[in-house]
Amino acid sequence: MEEQQRARSHTVTTTTSSFAENFSTTSSSFAYDREFLRTPPGLLIVAEIVLGLLVWTLIAGTEYFRVPAFGWVMFVAVFYWVLTVFFLIVYITLTYTRIPQVPWTTVGLCFNGSAFVLYFSAAIVDASSVSPEKEGHNFNSWAASSFFAFLVTICYAGNTYFSFIAWRSRTAQ
């Protein structure tokens, strides 16, 4: 009987790595930049999030799948809305200062430039697909989404400008 109990017992050894210790100390200090929301790029990002949310919710609340062009508009609106929320979190929490390997000014310029171009194409597709004859009861939602899509495009154009200024000043050094 004692032999069976000895066979069942085993020794557990635990070790800690320096990575785990470093991780716990760095995650306890949480930085927050509330002044970012008062800068022009910060205000534009908030406007992009609010207006972008309006674009895709106004379309999602309709039978948009009957008009294939709205699939493109939905893809662009949701994709860039999620990424813009991600970038807002990165900027507010100062995560970009903890990851210096990433060229954040170049990433911001590429992101905002691509968002401007693709949102502009989506806004044109959105506006050209709005017709009271196709789906009369969806007309108002689609027309409003088209209007807000152009406003989001203007916001991304403004952020592209500010990103370009930051990128140019960074590369000139």
Curated annotation (Swiss-Prot):
GO molecular function, one term: cytokine activity
Domain MARVEL, chain residue ranges per copy: 36-168
Primary site of residence: membrane
Family matches, as PANTHER family: CKLF-LIKE MARVEL TRANSMEMBRANE DOMAIN-CONTAINING PROTEIN 8 (PTHR22776:SF10), MARVEL-CONTAINING POTENTIAL LIPID RAFT-ASSOCIATED PROTEIN (PTHR22776)
Family matches, as PROSITE patterns: MARVEL (PS51225)
Spans traversing the lipid bilayer: 41-61, 70-90, 105-125, 147-167
Gene name in the database record: Cmtm8
Family stated for the protein in its record: Belongs to the chemokine-like factor family.
Organism: Mus musculus
Compartmental location: Membrane
Protein name, as recorded: CKLF-like MARVEL transmembrane domain-containing protein 8
